[in-house]
């Protein structure tokens, strides 16, 4: 694996010079191998190690290099034709392979090659970009978008129209991460490498980026870039220091543990916020 990483790192330093016409065989094979490993879930752009999320920047570099070495080509679709550098993940799937991998794909869901989809996942008409990782038992609902290299945990529900941001550029940015057992409400957006920790519930229409204030009304604490585990979050506003105006924020209205969450439905958690 170290040799593969070295090839990617070296090629990335001269990426501006690389084109589909002049890409050398070693680089091309290394990039294709990484994309295949991401596609199968054998590698992932970010993983939790000793309780901390670690981003493997060289894998993101490999994804970026894939755009340098591959030319656009016609991609056949059921209702149209497309022209892109990245093939579709399911282009060569047959019924046996779908049965083996154990997930459902509802038309016209689109998944790019290099994204991993785990067993018992349901993809409604949605979009999953290259480098993303969608873990077991997750529902990606209608018109939801999972951005490049985003990490989605087990038993997550991404409701209709949810946007999970991609972060291939800038390279130092970490991917957006939704941990296990989270619920993201309809039309909410989580972007810019924000981490939504395990068991959190995000209400409909909540927008969270790195600069969004995440206000815990119980403690008065303000978080940035991280929703603490077990949070129930709604959209709100905080007043300016001079009291002349207010600005958008996300508000943690309560905290729930796994036991409470198991007994009480998502709708009940969101309705009883007073």
Curated annotation (Swiss-Prot):
Annotated EC: 2.3.1.117
Any one GO MF annotation of this record: 2,3,4,5-tetrahydropyridine-2,6-dicarboxylate N-succinyltransferase activity
Signal sequence bounds: none
Pathway, per record: Amino-acid biosynthesis; L-lysine biosynthesis via DAP pathway; LL-2,6-diaminopimelate from (S)-tetrahydrodipicolinate (succinylase route): step 1/3
Major enzyme class: transferase
Xref: InterPro entries: DapD_Trfase_Hexpep_rpt_fam, Hexapep, Hexapep_transf_CS, THP_succinylTrfase_dom1, THP_succinylTrfase_N_sf, Trimer_LpxA-like_sf
GO cellular component, one term: cytoplasm
Keyword Mitochondrion: no
Entry-linked PANTHER family: 2,3,4,5-TETRAHYDROPYRIDINE-2,6-DICARBOXYLATE N-SUCCINYLTRANSFERASE, MOLYBDENUM COFACTOR GUANYLYLTRANSFERASE
Subunit-level organization: Homotrimer.
UniProt protein name: 2,3,4,5-tetrahydropyridine-2,6-dicarboxylate N-succinyltransferase
Annotated source species: Escherichia coli O6:H1 (strain CFT073 / ATCC 700928 / UPEC)
Lineage: Bacteria, Pseudomonadati, Pseudomonadota, Gammaproteobacteria, Enterobacterales
